[in-house]
Amino acid sequence: MRRAPDRGLALNFGQDLSPDLQSLVFATQGATHSEVLGTPIKAAAWHTKPSWFVIAANDRMISPDQERDTAKRMGAKTLTLPTSHLPMLSQPAKVADFVIEAAASFAANAAAPGGMLKTAVA
């Protein structure tokens, strides 16, 4: 039996998902552990590593303007999609292509003379 999605999820978290996918998210999305929000970060990787950021233009959980500002501060390569908070579910192919682009960029950098791969092997 399909469980109806939570109204808040349907309207504000995954508003661009099908009702079946909303139901799946509702059934499987766990609560955020408080330690995640309260644990200080000692070193943010984006200070020293290339970053990629998917901006969800129709996100109702995190302001898209805040997402853009964060990506800019990180110096991240961005992909803006007209999606809810869950672009990986509503537009998985576009998100996957972006992840593949990021991985290919890292691999190319690592293999270049003086790149990360040479440094790690040396």
Labelled PLM ranges:
Residues 1-6, 33, 70, 111-117:
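Flexible "cap/lid" loop of the alpha/beta hydrolase fold
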